[in-house]
């Protein structure tokens, strides 16, 4: 139903603008000027009056739309901008970034005279006042996943790879259920850098200190990561031609930016290439779009890359240069960098999972140094620097004692400051003067089947378990 906008200046009737004034009645005959003179004078008067009237009407016509447009467009534009900024401010507040939310509202010109904006500012200030500092960042848990199974029929088809998938992977259905449980149990994603960071001391030195995480009472921070986000060829390419195909085992084949969003490429059982939420990153993004309060100030997961088969599904390691050719290799590097930039912009952290997926705790210091150098030269040079190392196989270079020795010296010189092993404890964090260590808890088929009690603070395995998973899960 159309309604009349009281702000709109009515337009003139087009017919009114073209109607000439009625001719005046002819005066009675009298002696004086000749009849022809009088007729000429009358016609001249009519012409002059008509011209004046037209000028007046045109002038009013020109002014009315301009005034009408300004009167209508300016408030509308202001309202649209206000609504957009207010929606973003509410999202920031939902993610516990109250200062940015307040700054967004007070950045709107004239906000003091808009009741809705005044109320929003007051609400954000009240929420900030109620937030409490998380008392002990060393009790923050860290959970991790491998590549998610998109098609259980292909992953669990009885081939030699089925056992490994059953042991070390979770399905998309299970991952979504885990997210829902974590959310319902008041966990909130934080970045690993939120646990602790460098702070300049009075003497000019730098020391890592516990971070200040402010959340509503009852909320609990948690770190999430994913290993091997390179999309191994053996999982997606059945004929060895370097391309994903229908003979793959039901996993995404790469991350990419499509229509401005991070998504996955996936080749289904019919050989059709699809794009969508087929692995952790887009699935987590989907969840956070519905539940922004599951993220602390925009934090998402840490994405760990194993370098020898590239990054994010792009074969950018030196071994692929000759195979791909210069042009295709350069394009792969460009695409990988685009994904890395998009991940960071979305709130993800990128980590090294080594170059060759070697057990850093067992190999020699020389071999570790060579592997780290390959990561730095072939992978980091493309996707950007990181200070986070997630040990392959969880194999740490030391026990609970402080780091020292050649291995640590190499990794520290290569820029790593956050080091994560794998541990079954609910949480394990060390904050040292120059670095941070954290234990990660694996969420996978093996842990869910044999040790569900180690996960019961996070979720109920019975409600998460995907019945498409074969049992028993093979023992390790």
What are these regions (language model features)?
Residues 1-33:
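N-terminal targeting leaders characterized by basic, low-complexity, disordered sequences
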Residues 53-67:
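Hydrophobic single-pass membrane-insertion segments
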Residues 29-46:
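N-terminal Sec-pathway targeting helices
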Residues 85, 175, 335-336, 404:
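Amphipathic coiled-coil/heptad-repeat helices and related helical stalk/stem segments
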Residues 63-130:
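N-terminal, intrinsically disordered, polar/charged segments of Gram-positive cell-envelope systems
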Residues 138-158, 207-208, 216-222, 229-397, ...:
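Metal-dependent polysaccharide deacetylase catalytic core of the NodB/CE4 family, i.e.
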Residues 47-52:
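Alpha-helical transmembrane segments
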Residues 102-105, 110-111, 125-195, 204, ...:
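C-terminal active-site subregion of NodB/CE4 polysaccharide deacetylases
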């Amino acid at each position: 139903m159309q309604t009349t906008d009281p702000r709109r200046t009515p337009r003139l009737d087009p017919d009114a603008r073209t109607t000439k004034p009625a001719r005046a009645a002819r005066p009675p005959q009298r002696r004086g000027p000749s009849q022809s003179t009088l007729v000429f004078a009358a016609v001249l008067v009519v012409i002059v009056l008509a011209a004046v009237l037209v000028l007046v009407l045109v002038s009013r016509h020109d002014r009315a739309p301009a005034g009408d447009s300004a009167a209508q467009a300016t408030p509308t534009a202001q309202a649209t901008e206000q609504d957009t900024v207010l929606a973003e401010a509410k999202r920031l507040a939902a993610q516990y970034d109250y200062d940015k939310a307040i700054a967004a509202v007070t950045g709107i010109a004239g906000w003091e005279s808009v009741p809705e904006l005044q109320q929003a500012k007051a609400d954000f200030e009240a929420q900030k006042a109620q937030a409490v500092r998380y008392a002990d960042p060393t009790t923050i848990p860290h959970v991790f996943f491998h590549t998610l199974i998109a098609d259980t029929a292909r992953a669990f088809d009885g081939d030699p790879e089925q056992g490994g998938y059953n042991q070390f992977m979770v399905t998309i259905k299970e991952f979504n259920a885990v997210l829902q449980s974590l959310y319902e149990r008041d966990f909130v994603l934080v970045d690993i850098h939120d646990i602790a960071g460098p702070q300049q001391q009075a003497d000019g030195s730098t020391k890592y200190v516990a971070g200040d995480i402010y959340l509503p009472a009852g909320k609990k921070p948690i770190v999430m990561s994913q290993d091997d986000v390179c999309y191994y060829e053996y999982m997606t390419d059945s004929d060895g031609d370097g391309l994903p195909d229908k003979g793959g085992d039901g996993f995404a084949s790469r991350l990419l930016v499509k229509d401005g969003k991070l998504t996955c490429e996936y080749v289904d059982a019919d050989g059709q290439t699809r794009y969508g939420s087929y692995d952790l990153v887009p699935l987590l993004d989907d969840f956070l779009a519905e539940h922004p309060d599951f993220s602390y100030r925009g934090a998402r997961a840490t994405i760990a890359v194993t370098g020898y088969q590239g990054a994010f599904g792009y074969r950018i390691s030196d071994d692929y240069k000759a195979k791909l050719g210069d042009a295709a290799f350069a394009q792969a590097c460009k695409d990988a960098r685009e994904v890395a930039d998009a991940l960071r912009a979305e709130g993800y952290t990128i980590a090294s999972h080594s170059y060759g997926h070697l057990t850093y705790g067992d190999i020699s210091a020389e071999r570790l140094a060579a592997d780290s150098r390959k990561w730095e030269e072939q992978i980091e040079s493309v996707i950007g620097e990181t200070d986070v190392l997630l040990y392959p196989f969880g194999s740490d270079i030391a026990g609970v004692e402080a780091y020292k020795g050649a291995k640590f010296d190499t990794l520290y010189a290569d820029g790593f400051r956050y080091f994560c092993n794998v541990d079954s404890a609910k949480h394990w964090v060390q904050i040292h003067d120059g670095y941070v260590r954290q234990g990660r808890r694996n969420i996978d088929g093996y842990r869910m089947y044999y040790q569900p009690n180690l996960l019961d603070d996070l979720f109920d395995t019975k409600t998460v378990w995907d019945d498409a998973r074969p049992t028993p899960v093979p023992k390790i």
